[in-house]
């Protein structure tokens, strides 16, 4: 099998391909390219795979692709809708359902979001007869979080891709805490899930700010990069981070790798607090007009 991506084609139909797109249409440009590449792979004994986010807009074009082609149908929202999965299934195409562990742009993964997303997508795979589930871990703007935070999400994928029974979030987290981490209290993963909520200034907003100020990229209309960044929010997050650290310390006392886990957690929790302070400082200096990068 060969995956040749073909996703997020933001520049297709613009710049060099603008004139051709005006003549033939953006969707036609896309499907002709994918079809040519897929046919080449089939002729050479391979099974082509591609991400499905572009063809969602014109699912009927799936009928032009080789029958062996596999569509990797991704969606990462906690309340991910099933419309795209249904549309691809109705064409008779072969598809994988691809949820995610929700670590992109985060210092610590959005664990509850990943649980909701993965349970939904695995359910859609069963409902629409997908041939598999591909659980994903991405790092938008650089993979800033430690991969260890993706472990609960990876386990959710292993559980629900094979088991149609929906195990409640808290119950499954207790199981993972005990079996994966050796935490006899059963609370470790539930405490991990609290960390992400304390990021007042997000990594994505920092990157957007840099690109706007230094690279002169335009922001989306109405976008406020410092929404919710204020002294009260930063102080509340700092208090919450200290409380989470204490709870995690208690959970890790019975774990076989206490020191290793606490080193990771200490760096991450302190990092979130520092980054929140950076956001507050940047927001304050932006208001005074004295900040110059």
Segments predicted by a language model, with ranges:
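Short, small-residue-biased leader/transition segments that mark boundaries at the very start
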Residues: 2-3, 293
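Substrate-binding groove of N-acetylhexosamine-processing glycoside hydrolases
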Residues: 20-293
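Active-site-proximal, well-structured secondary-structure segments within enzyme catalytic domains
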Residues: 5-27
